[in-house]
């Protein structure tokens, strides 16, 4: 009887810990699944036309960029074969709506075939200054533009 009592006491102590562990594992799994569902591309209200991008030295021209609200067209570099969203090499201000023949100068220069990410950022505080200051581990003040789980952006090669 004494052994059964000890086992029951241990079970009562371990049961909530096991439940908590299962809950934490389920939450981590849901976060991983949610993060893996994020994609890049165009949306219904925000888009970047990447077909036919032209280049004049280090300046690129996009025929059409649509943004719902004022914001920025931003270019992030690839480094060691992967995009580096922690820095940017070009930005240009966009007004709400359709913007035609958008030019953006890449400060570091361009090499034909070089990969980069072109994406939209919202001018959150409407000051016409790209506030590329991290507010947490992943997001800058002028946040990336999303439609649902689609981040409005593209990985493209320099022409």
Indicate residue ranges for each PLM-predicted region.
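Short, surface-exposed binding/anchoring microloops in extracellular/periplasmic proteins
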Residues: 41-86
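Acidic, glycine-anchored loop motifs typical of Ca2+
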Residues: 83, 124-133, 139
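Solvent-exposed serine/threonine-rich low-complexity stretches and specific carbohydrate-binding patches
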Residues: 85-98
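Short, aromatic- and glycine-rich surface loops/edge beta-strands on solvent-exposed regions
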Residues: 114-124
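C-terminal partner/receptor-binding element of secreted or periplasmic proteins
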Residues: 132-159
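Bacterial N-terminal signal peptides
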Residues: 17-25
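Exposed aromatic-hydrophobic patches
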Residues: 61-62, 98-109
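Bacterial N-terminal signal peptides that target proteins for export
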Residues: 6-17
């Amino acid at each position: 009887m004494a052994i059964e009592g000890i086992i029951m006491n241990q079970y009562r102590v371990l049961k909530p810990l096991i439940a908590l562990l299962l809950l934490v594992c389920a939450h981590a799994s849901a976060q991983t699944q949610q993060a893996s569902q994020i994609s890049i591309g165009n949306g219904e209200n925000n888009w970047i036309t990447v077909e036919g991008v032209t280049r004049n030295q280090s300046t690129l021209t996009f025929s059409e960029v649509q943004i719902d609200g004022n914001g920025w067209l931003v270019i992030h570099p690839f480094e060691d074969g992967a995009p580096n969203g922690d820095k940017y090499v070009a930005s240009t201000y966009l007004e709400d709506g359709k913007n035609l023949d958008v030019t953006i100068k890449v400060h570091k220069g361009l090499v034909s075939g070089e990969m980069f990410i072109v994406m939209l950022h919202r001018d959150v505080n409407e000051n016409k200054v790209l506030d590329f200051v991290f507010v947490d581990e992943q997001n800058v003040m002028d946040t990336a533009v999303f439609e649902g789980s689609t981040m409005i952006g593209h990985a493209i090669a320099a022409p």
